[in-house]
Structure formats: structure tokens, C-alpha cells
């Protein structure tokens, strides 16, 4: 993807409250403010969007970089999806109660 080609691409808002967890980066300070990923979530799914919601809850918005940044994906085996509904409930609670900090997160390792 080449920035020059962005001149020919569909224009989208640079700032956005809609983020996709599969390709994202953030400031370390903001990550620590929300205590990182919620390690209370089990299996595959929702961990990234739940964390993004907590970033939104402290006022952090994303910046879209479509066609202007390179993203790498590290291969990993798929995880168990049997807890996806429970994870959705936790994400919904994070949104409704405007939760910004979780107990079981990165603080365990700092």
C-alpha cells in the first residue's frame, strides 16, 4: 500500500470511534491506563474489541490508516470459541457501565 495511491481511494474520516482489533497500535501509557487486555476473557474473540471499548471510555479515538500502513500478522492456531457469548456479555457491560479499568490485566506483569 502506497500513500500516493490514497489520492485515488475513497476518502474516509481520519479519526474514528470504530476500530478493528486485528490491526492496531496504541500508546503504552494508554494501554497501562486501562490495564491492557482483559485476561478474564476466555478463548477466542472479543478481547480486542472489549479493550478498544475501554480505550474509548477514557476518550481515546482511533486513527484510520487504510492503504497507508503495513500490517503483519503472526500465525497462531485458532482458540476455543465456546465462551464467545460470555465474552460478548462482558463487552456489553464494558460499554454500558463505561468500564475503563479491569482487575486482571497487564498489571500482573509490570
Where are the model-predicted features located?
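Catalytic core of nucleotide-sugar-dependent glycosyltransferases
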Residues: 68, 82-106
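Active-site donor/metal-binding and catalytic loop motifs
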Residues: 65-82
Amino acid at each position: 500500500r502506497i500513500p500516493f495511491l490514497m489520492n485515488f481511494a475513497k476518502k474516509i474520516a481520519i479519526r474514528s470511534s470504530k476500530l478493528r482489533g486485528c490491526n492496531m497500535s496504541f500508546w503504552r501509557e494508554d494501554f497501562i491506563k486501562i490495564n491492557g487486555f482483559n485476561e478474564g476473557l476466555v478463548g477466542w474473540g472479543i478481547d480486542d474489541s472489549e479493550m478498544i471499548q475501554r480505550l474509548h471510555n477514557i476518550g481515546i479515538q482511533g486513527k484510520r490508516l487504510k492503504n497507508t500502513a503495513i500490517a503483519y500478522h503472526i500465525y497462531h492456531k485458532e482458540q476455543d470459541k465456546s465462551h464467545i457469548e460470555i465474552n460478548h456479555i462482558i463487552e456489553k457491560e464494558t460499554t454500558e457501565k463505561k468500564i475503563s479499568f479491569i482487575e486482571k490485566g497487564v498489571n500482573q506483569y509490570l
